[in-house]
């Protein structure tokens, strides 16, 4: 009887110590793969879901949409955007997949512009031109993130005066909303302390 009790206790202890498998998102992502530090700031994965069970996964590294699970014409849930499975992949395989682009989306000719009679020279990271805010644009920065409710995520990034050559301290906010009609509503807001240029967008590949 004593041996049976010992074995029973041992079995219970083993069961208690066995780690539970981490739950994945509907698109198969593990949140732990998005939890690390980049430039001293913590990254994470945030999941939005609506009443139709549409799921949108977003990381605050670059303000990126990582996956979008939405029903296809046959009602089957499919991931319809390109994205990586971890922060490390986004770092080691530089791309604009799903990213919030800033300060200035698209190309600035020769990386130069004049504002209020002041000439500015930006990094020329694309065949002699400045593309998507430079080599360290918003897509490679860590945003502050606040999950407002199950369907809304607020992302905030403050760029300092002179970052990537652009003038002015600027606070940029990106509000991502998953609506109940299966749409993603993205709203941009920027506040600066001196004349500057800003042109933000999202760079998802569908």
Predicted regions located by residue number:
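Sec-dependent signal peptide recognition
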Residues: 2-8
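C-terminal motif of bacterial Sec signal peptides marking the signal peptidase cleavage site
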Residues: 14-16
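Surface-exposed acidic/polar loop and edge beta-strand patches at domain peripheries
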Residues: 18-206
């Amino acid at each position: 009887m004593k041996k049976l009790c010992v074995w029973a206790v041992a079995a219970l202890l083993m069961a208690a110590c066995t780690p539970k498998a981490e739950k994945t998102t509907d698109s198969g992502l593990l949140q732990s793969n998005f939890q690390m530090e980049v430039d001293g700031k913590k990254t994470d994965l945030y999941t939005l879901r609506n009443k139709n069970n549409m799921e949108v996964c977003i990381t605050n590294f670059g303000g990126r949409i990582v996956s979008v699970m939405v029903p296809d014409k046959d009602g089957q849930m499919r991931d319809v955007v390109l994205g990586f499975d971890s922060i490390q992949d986004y770092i080691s395989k530089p791309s604009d997949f799903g990213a919030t682009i800033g300060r200035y989306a698209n190309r600035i000719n020769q990386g130069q512009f004049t504002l209020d009679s002041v000439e500015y020279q930006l990094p020329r990271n694309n065949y002699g031109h400045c593309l998507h805010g430079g080599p360290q644009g918003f897509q490679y920065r860590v945003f502050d993130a606040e999950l407002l409710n199950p369907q809304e995520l607020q992302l905030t990034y403050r760029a300092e005066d002179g970052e990537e050559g652009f003038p002015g301290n600027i606070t940029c906010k990106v509000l991502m909303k998953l609506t109940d009609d299966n749409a993603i509503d993205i709203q941009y807001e920027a506040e600066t302390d001196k004349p500057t240029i800003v042109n933000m967008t999202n760079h998802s590949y569908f």
